[in-house]
UniProtKB/Swiss-Prot annotation:
Pfam families: TPR_EMC2
Main location class: cytoplasm
Species in which this protein is naturally found: Schizosaccharomyces pombe (strain 972 / ATCC 24843)
Disulfide feature: none
GO cellular component, one term: cytosol
Domain of life per record: Eukaryota
PROSITE patterns named among the record's database cross-references: TPR, TPR_REGION
Extent of the TPR repeats: 16-50, 71-104, 139-172, 174-211
GO-annotated biological processes: protein insertion into ER membrane
UniProt-recorded name of the protein: TPR repeat protein oca3
PANTHER family with a match to the protein in the record: TETRATRICOPEPTIDE REPEAT PROTEIN
Length: 282
């Protein structure tokens, strides 16, 4: 067990709560100095997760005493209401705060999260769209909107979200790989999208050569393309070239790329035994 609450993973809320209780009992919280406020927030969330609402309220009170009416503290109180009161009470609280300050981003996001948890997907989508009209640069909000679109199988809308994220972070390989994933899904009904999927996977490994997700995606795309008949492959390639001006690889290039992706995957597997086991299942 770590002796620092801040180093305990958020996925271990019981350990966080136990360590806090121990250190508080032995008056060891002073060692955190200015980081004590991060400790209180971490313990607050962990306590809500484990159902220890008395401890959660105590942590919130200390944060509120120090940062009264701050956006972060008000957002945490909304989380407390979600866990201890009714959804209606929490929503009323969020609406009240937004009527005071429509630009309160923390509260706005908490409200949207609550809408999603309540199954009000359409309202959540519209709320995120409205939010992004004002706060376009919020990558987290774009990712949330994309995730919701994927959950309702609106893959083309999800692609739009990731394309917007790419504009904000053009050198993030994970975004291009995710675009590759989405085009791969669309390719199940329209094989032309294998080319677009391949293009984005290739861009992800161009940015980061050691990015396994990208190489694995390349191997899957190439495998699908090589299983097509030569006539069908040429027909798809002509369709792709009609849509965009990019030069896509020919059949031989796809074959070479496939072999390269397999070699790369083998190298990753040699370094990571667990990854090797997963690859053997694919």
């Amino acid at each position: 067990m770590s002796n620092s609450i801040l180093k305990v993973p958020d996925q271990n809320p019981q350990e966080i709560v136990a360590l806090f209780s121990q250190q508080e009992a032995y008056a060891k919280l002073g060692k955190y100095k200015d980081e004590i406020w991060d400790v209180y927030q971490k313990v607050f969330i962990a306590a809500l997760t484990t159902g220890e609402t008395v401890l959660a309220k105590k942590c919130w009170n200390r944060l509120n005493d120090r940062f009264h009416k701050s956006p972060r503290v008000e957002g945490l109180y909304g989380m407390f209401l979600e866990a201890t009161a009714s959804e209606k009470d929490a929503m009323s609280y969020y609406n009240s705060k937004l009527s005071e300050d429509p630009t309160h981003t923390v509260i706005y996001k908490r409200k949207l999260a609550l809408l999603r948890s309540m199954g009000q997907t359409k309202e959540c989508i519209q709320g995120l769209i409205n939010y992004l009209d004002t706060f376009y640069n919020d990558l987290e909000a774009w990712a949330e909107l994309a995730d919701i679109y994927v959950s309702v199988e609106a893959f083309e809308s999800a692609i739009f979200c990731y394309e917007e994220m790419v504009l904000l972070q053009p050198f993030e390989p994970r975004l291009f790989a995710r675009l590759g994933d989405l085009y791969f899904v669309l390719a199940q009904s329209n094989a032309t999208n294998y080319w677009f999927s391949l293009k984005h996977y290739c861009r992800s490994v161009e940015i980061c050569e050691e990015y396994f997700h990208g190489w694995f995606g390349i191997s899957k795309c190439c495998q699908q393309l090589l299983e097509l008949s030569r006539t069908e492959l040429k027909r798809l390639l002509s369709k792709v070239n009609e849509k965009i001006s990019d030069t896509f690889p020919d059949t031989e290039s796809v074959r070479q790329l496939y072999q390269l992706s397999l070699k790369k995957s083998d190298l990753f597997a040699q370094k990571q035994p667990k990854l090797k086991a997963l690859l053997e299942q694919c």
